Structure formats: C-alpha cells, structure tokens
UniProtKB/Swiss-Prot annotation:
This is SsrA-binding protein. It comes from Stutzerimonas stutzeri (strain A1501) (Pseudomonas stutzeri). One of its GO terms (biological process) is trans-translation. Signal peptide: none annotated. SUPFAM superfamilies: Small protein B (SmpB). The keyword RNA-binding applies. Belongs to the SmpB family. Required for rescue of stalled ribosomes mediated by trans-translation. Binds to transfer-messenger RNA (tmRNA), required for stable association of tmRNA with ribosomes. tmRNA and SmpB together mimic tRNA shape, replacing the anticodon stem-loop with SmpB. tmRNA is encoded by the ssrA gene; the 2 termini fold to resemble tRNA(Ala) and it encodes a 'tag peptide', a short internal open reading frame. During trans-translation Ala-aminoacylated tmRNA acts like a tRNA, entering the A-site of stalled ribosomes, displacing the stalled mRNA. Gene3D superfamilies: 2.40.280.10.
Length: 160
C-alpha cells in the first residue's frame, strides 16, 4: 500500500478533487464564521471539503457543502448540522474580484483547504476554470513522467 503524504502541521483538510478538476487561476485567504462545536471538531481534524464550493450572493461569500463531523462529546444543547452553510470573511476588494470573475463563462470559486493561522481557522479559496477530460489526462501523464524522472534520478545515484 502506498504511503500517505503527511499534511503540513497547520492543515486541517484539503480538497484534492478541486486540484484535479480545475485550473487554479488565483487564490484567496478567507476567514470562517464557525460555531463552538465546529472549532472543536476541526481541532480533531473531522472535516471534508470534497464537494464544497463557494456561493457568491448579495455581496457576501458562503461556503457550501463542506462537511464538519460533530464530535459526540460536543454540543449537547445545540443540534449540530454538519453541512450547514458557513459565511466566508473577505474584504470588499477581494469580493469584487470574485464577483467579476465568476460572471465570466467557465469560472468557478472553490474551496481548496482549511488550515490554522495562529489561533484562527482560515479557508483557502480559489478562482478556478474547469478542466476538460483531455486536460485531466494530460496532467496525469505529466505527473507520471515526472515520477519516472525522479525514480531514475534516485536509482542513478545508488548505482555508483
């Protein structure tokens, strides 16, 4: 079985599917409005961003489809909704860029990762353009050839 890559210490969750399905044009860092039980769950690493996206409406950005699994010990008096819509905190200039770009055909706004920055949880969102099927195959071929080159470089050093 292949070794799992270690995430950097501040990373809570990654959206690898977005990196596979989209060309990333521009990245933004956004704050999140969270409830207390959500922060506890994120400390435990119980988050998934696989089918999440960013919805832009009424001059605000919202994180949709992100799944934060509630802990069994947390939130006994509050009903925890794991896939609730969460508000993203961006400044007006960044929101303007996102609104303008998403209006263009083919652009989408997706969540790439959740991570800790000091004591706050941040969400990295990206302005992205969808990949076609042949683009995905081309990216996979490039990745395979890079892997072969790296393997050859490692074995070349050991032959000496």
């Amino acid at each position: 079985m292949a070794k799992q890559k270690k995430q950097s210490p501040g990373t809570i969750a990654l959206n690898k599917k977005a990196l596979h399905d989209y060309f990333i044009e521009q990245k933004f860092e956004a704050g999140l409005v969270l409830a207390g039980w959500e922060v506890k769950s994120l400390r435990a690493g119980k988050a998934q961003l696989v089918d999440s996206y960013v919805l832009l409406k009424d001059g605000e950005a919202w994180l949709m489809g992100a799944h934060i699994t509630p802990l069994t010990s947390a939130s006994t008096h509050v009903i925890a909704d794991p896939t609730r819509t969460r508000k993203l905190l961006l400044n007006k200039r960044e929101l303007g860029k996102l609104f303008g770009a998403v209006q263009q055909k083919g652009y989408a706004c997706v969540a790439l990762s959740l991570y800790w920055k000091k004591h706050m949880i941040k969400c990295e969102i990206a302005l992205a353009k969808g990949k076609k099927e042949f683009d995905k195959r081309h990216t996979e071929k490039e990745r395979d050839s890079d892997r072969e080159i790296q393997r050859a470089m490692r074995t070349k050093g050991k032959d000496d």
